[in-house]
Every structure is written in structure tokens, then in C-alpha cells.
Amino acid sequence: MAQKMLEDQDMLDQLLSGVHDSDLDFSESEEEEEEEESSSESESDEDSDMEVEPARQEAGPPEQCQQQPQQRAREQQPPPQQQQPQQREQGPPQQQQQQRTPKRGEESGDARPRARAPSGDAGPGPSGQARLPQQQQPQQPQQPPPKPPRQEVTVRAPGDRQQPQSQAAQPIPVIGGGCAPFQLRAPIAAAAATGWGGEQAPAQPLFQHVSPLNRRGDEDRRSGRDRRRREGRERDRESRSKGRNWYRPYPRGSSGARREGGGRDAGQGQGTRNPGPSQGGCEAGPSQAQAAQAARAPRQEQGERRQMLPQGQNLGPRPQQCPPQQCPPQPCPPFPLEALPILRAKFEPSCAVSYTNLVKSIQKIAMPPFLMRRREASPPCHFSKIPQATPGLVIPAAARTGEAKFEKFTDAFVQKVIDRGMSPQDCINKTVSLRKLDAKFDPLKTFTAKTVNFGQWLDVRKDSIINSGMSTQVVFLEELCAWAKLNLQHGCNLEERDLILHTAETVCSQLMYKLKPIMSCLEPNKPYASMAKQMAYLVCGAGRIQDAGMLLREVKVGSPLTMLVAFSLCVPVMITCRNRNPSLFNYCKSFLDMYQPGLLCALFNTMTSKLNTTCTEEECYASVRAAIGSVVNTRGLLFVPGI
């Protein structure tokens, strides 16, 4: 039994001699040590296969065997003040706990096999005891895995957004694995913008949106740029003076003059130099040359400072050192183009002119987006607006002659003119000499201006003018020119209410409309034909009668077609521009001064009697005959001036 106790003592000595000082860490409380020792003893008693139980029973209780190693460990343990720095040097507490647990199992006699045993360990020997190595190598503390770097977040102000330092792209996972091509990049520092003096401004983070339709992320930059342009344009509209040429973004001068003080932001006197004291300017104000010299001096100083800096460093934006009155104006951004609706038609080189005209037309009419066909399959119209079909049923406009009121005049001539005017008689029966019309002008003027059936007469006259050929329109034009000439001779205003003068624009536009498709057949001279076509476009297509009169004043008429067009234009132009353009009024009056009864009928007959020899097709003759008309409708015509 004594020999058994000596063997146990040797075993404990070898165990304590092989343990490294760093493994003996008893910094925990004594209560935890007692609990761990009791648990290890219970496990060793139940699981151990070695015959240690008889030796313990002979030697006494097991606490006596464990008192000696505990006393030695306590002697080697440093005080609590020295234990804390030693624990920090040894490593994290998790590693220490892992190192203490197997050693205490060996102290308690636990000889269970382990997954990874040292090279010197072996299984139980023939005596039933575990063979231990002569000296156990100290275990090196395991290094913990490196933790990912924390993303530092800097909050400058309560309203600032938190921007992580990581600039890597953050792909969006999709179903099935992989990443979608649609990614949202982290804030990317924009390139340093060039300042006013050439210095580099601080970079600003921009959010770029990358998608298959926006691969380079230009949409976000473009939207911000357009917004800044709109704000600048509104600001310029408020501050810009409404002087001469105020609508120009910069003066007509050279770019050098614009750099020295011209431009949209230059204030009053855009594009002009500041007047000196001798020119009536402010004596205290600096000249333009002084302002430019003052602006160049800081730039030179800024360049010298930039040369002194090491490579890769830029200067910040230079603060404004001069008053706003002396500093040159900032360059204004160009005007943004107006947004156009998406056109379904595609640009083709062969139809470039047509495409350009299409764009101009859409810009002119300001077509709203909901009226544009965005797709090829879009319907051509709103089918809900189409009513039910009524084949063969057309409702004509009935004449208002039945609503006319009875009126009686004491003058027999006026009564005779009224009776003939309502009936579709021949032109010869309605012919009245110009001298008799001049003699009976006052009672006839009273009827044309104060008749109670004014609306009914206009209805009948316009119906005959619009629904008839050129022969009927030329007869109404004869009546119009003769009556306008008599009004001017008697000092009447052409703008007053008058039954005959009120239809002047209708006669002019309808005659131009009938002449336009056959002008090439009626006029062999191309310059005269082109002039007549342009006047017809201004009157019929655009309704610009005054512009057509101004064009007439700039050219010289010399053919039956152009003279007929000039006589049809003179009366409507005189009615509209008497107070607006007196010179044009006097020019058109010269046509009425040389008017004679029957002159327009003679021009018309000369023009239609001999057609252009180049037109030999039957379709051309058919168009001319249809425009001239086969019947002269004189319903509503009061008189035909004669000699």
C-alpha cells in the first residue's frame, strides 16, 4: 500500500512538472473551482476504467490526494493585482478555459481517449494506469479569426445621410442564384469640378443608377443638370432687364467682349463696356480693364501656390475676394432644348426634310402627349366618338329667306335693287351704271348699313360666293371694288357695318382658293405664278391678309393673274390696316383709283381664254372648267357696276 501511494505521488509530480505556468490560471473564484473539481471527480469515478478506487480507500479520502497539488498551485499563483496584466498577455479567456479543462481532467485521473492526443500519450498499461509523457509541450494559444472591418459612419449634421466608407458595388441577389444586371451602386465620389479660377472644387458624392437602359449612370446627372438649368433660367428671367435685345443670351460681339463683361448676367447694357467718366459714367466705378486685371491677379497667385504643392494635391475653391460689382460674371449654362414628344416616325436620310417639317409642325401646334400615337398598334382614332351610320341621309342647310321681315323704302331705286338682289337673275339685268350708283349712294348706304334683315342677306350672299365658281366670285368682286371706291369718295369708313363690305374677306379667300390649284395652268411665267401661290398661301392657309398685302407692295404685278389677285386683296387689306399701317392703306387705295367697271371681268376672260400650252392632259382642262364654273349664281348680288 505504501508503494502504491509512492507511485501516485510520483505520478502527480510528473503531472505538475509537465504543466506550463501559463496553463495554471486560477483567476476564477474559489466557489467555481470547487464546483468544477467536484464535477470532474464525479465523472472520473464513473467513467474511469483504472483500479484507483482501492488505493484511495486505503490512503484515506480523495481530498487528501488533491490537497497537495492545490497547495502548490496556490503558491505559484500570483496575487490578484499581478494576475490581471498576466491574464491580458496570455490571451482571451475562451482559450484559457479550453486549456484548463483537459489539464484538470488529468489531475482528477480522467484517462478517457481524446480525438487528438499528443504524440507521447498512450493507452492504459498492463498495471491499469495511464502512461504519461515525460514532459508535455506547452500549447500555443490559437489566434482568433480576423473580424471584418467595421464600417465607420460619420454624421456631420442631424439632417445628413450616413454614407459608409465601402465603395464596392452591392449586387441584388435573384431567384436561381447569381446577381441581376440591375445594380445600385454605393455613393461614388464625383470628379472634382473646375472652379472659376481653374482650381479644383471639392468632390461631392453622387448616386449613380446603373441599369440596362442606363449603363453609364448618366440619367441622374442629366436630371440634376436640367434642374439646375431650369433654376438658372428662371433666375435670369427675374433679374434680366427688358431692354433692347433682352431676349439674346449674349451680345452679337466677339467672344472676347463677352468674357470681359458681356453675357446674360451682365445686367443693364448687355454686351457693352462700362462708360468712363468722360462718357457720363460713374467716376467711382472701376473700368472693365481694371476689373479684368483684378481678376487675373488672383489667378496668377493661385497658379504659383499650386506649383508649390506636392503632386496629387489640389487647392480648394478660392473665396470671392472682390465685391460683386467688380467681379466678372459667371458663365451661364446653355439654354436647354424644349422636351419634344416621342415621335413614332423614324428619321430616314431620304425623308430628312419631311421629318424636320414634322417636328416643326408638332412644336408649333403644341400637341399634348395624350394625343400622340406612341405605338404602331395604337388605334387611329377614338371609336367611341363615331356615331351610327346613316347611309344616303344628308341634312342640307336651309336658307333663311323665309325668316326675312318685310321692309318698305320710299326710294323706288333702292326698292328695285332689293327686289332684284333676292332673285337669281342674269348679270345683265342687275347692271347699274357707276354714275347712278354715285347719285343714289346715300339711300343705298342706309339700306346696306341699317337693314333689319342684315343676317339673312349675309347668309344668302355667302352661300352664293362659297358654293359657286370663279365666274360668280369675279362678279361679286366687281360689286365690292365699285362700292368701296364710292365709300372712299363720299368719306365713309370702310370698317363700319356694311352689307357689301362685310363679305370682302370671304370673296378674297374663296377666289384665292379656286385659283391656287390651277395657277400653273393659267400663268406661264413662273415668277408670277410663284408670287400668286405665296399670296394664296398667306390668305387661305394662314389667314394673314395683312402680310399678303405687304408682299403685294414689295412686288410689281404684270400679268392678268397677279392683277386679279391684287384687286381681290386691296379691299380686305384696307379694311384691316387703315389705322395700323397707313402706308399700306394708301398703296392699296391706288388699285381702287384705277378701277373701272368691267376691268376685273376682262382680266378674268383674258386669263381663262388661253391656257398654258404645256398642259395637254384632259385632267388639267377638267380642273380649270370646274374652277371657273358653268353657271353664274347672282342670288344675293345687289348690282353689277357698269359704264
From Swiss-Prot:
Would I find Transcription regulation among this entry's keywords?
A: yes
Where does the record place the region Disordered?
A: 1-180, 194-329
Q: Where is the composition biased (Low complexity)?
A: 57-71, 83-100, 162-171, 284-297
Show the ranges annotated as biased composition (Pro residues): 320-329
Q: What is this protein called?
A: Immediate-early phosphoprotein 57
Instruction: Give the superkingdom in one word.
Output: Viruses
- Compositional bias (Acidic residues): 24-52
From its record, what is one biological process in GO terms? regulation of DNA-templated transcription
What gene name is listed for this protein? 57
Keywords, A to Z, come to:
Early protein, Phosphoprotein, Transcription, Transcription regulation
Family as reported in the entry's similarity comment: Belongs to the herpesviridae UL69 family.
The record's listing under Pfam families reads: Herpes_UL69 (PF05459)
InterPro entries to which the protein is assigned, alphabetical: ICP27-like (IPR008648)
Compositionally biased, Basic and acidic residues: which spans? 103-113, 215-241, 298-307
